[in-house]
Each structure stands twice: as C-alpha cells, then as structure tokens.
Amino acid sequence: MKSYDVMTLFAQQLERSIASSDECKTKVVITPSSVNEKGVVIKVSLLKTFRDKEYQAKSKARSVRLRVSVCGTVESQTGLKMATVLIEKLDDFFEQDSLRLEEIVEGANSMQTIRKIPNTRILQRISQEDSFFYNPDSTDVQDVQDDRTVIITVPEES
C-alpha cells in the first residue's frame, strides 16, 4: 500500500468514525488543500513516510507519520464548544482497542462493508505542552490548534 493511499484511507476512516452531529459539523481535510473551511476542521497532513524495520522483522513494513490537527477560527462560545467536542471525539477514536486502518469493500448486491486491514496499526502521540489557543488571555477572535502525531504502519508492497 502506498503512503498516499494510507493517508486517504485514514482521513476517510476519521470522517466515518467522527460523524457529524447537531452540536458539531465534522469536516476532515487532507492538506495541502484549496478547501478554505470557515470554523473548526480536522486537518490531516503528511509529515514523513519511511520503511520501518522494527515493526515486523519477517516482512517489510512502511510507516506513515501524519499530523492530525483540530484547527480553525473560534469566534464565539459555540465555536469553542465545537472545537472541544471534536478534540474529545478524536480522543474517543484513538482509545479504541487494536486500532487498525480500515477500507470500504464492495460486497454482493453492491453492499459496502468496512474491513480492517490486517497487519496494520495506528498509534498517536500527544504533547501535553501543545497550545490550544494562541493567546488564551485575549477576548478577540481566536485561532485554535490542537495537534497530535499519528503513526500508521502497514505492510509494504513487494
């Protein structure tokens, strides 16, 4: 599986798992993108892709390091609520046991099913020092940024 495919599948998986609700509209954007969403979005950015020799000694694996950010402009308490709800939904997503990359597979009668891709894993790292608001003491419109690093390891194509 190629790194771009991993990133795309992960973004789709996030969008499915963190479904929009009345209190929070969810938009997942892969950067770079010409999409200029108003409000708070989840951005997925490629940081690095590399052959991972430590994952499984018997087979070749590739690790894709991504930045997943809840970011945007908060103009009111409603925007602040939306940002915190998205962060909490991401926390819930990453707390799943044995988190694996998923893909949608066409089945009989054009039925789509979600399949966990074997021998994949998804890990996250969070820095407790990350800033949420750039200037928390200001009463002006605020830019928010909550970053986490995600590492997805997949079997490498032969």
Task: Give short role names for the model-derived ranges.
Residues K60-Q77, R121-Y134, D146-R148:
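Oligomerization/assembly interface segments of phage tail-like spikes and tubes
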Residues K89-Q145, E157:
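Acidic-leaning, charged glycine-interspersed low-complexity segments
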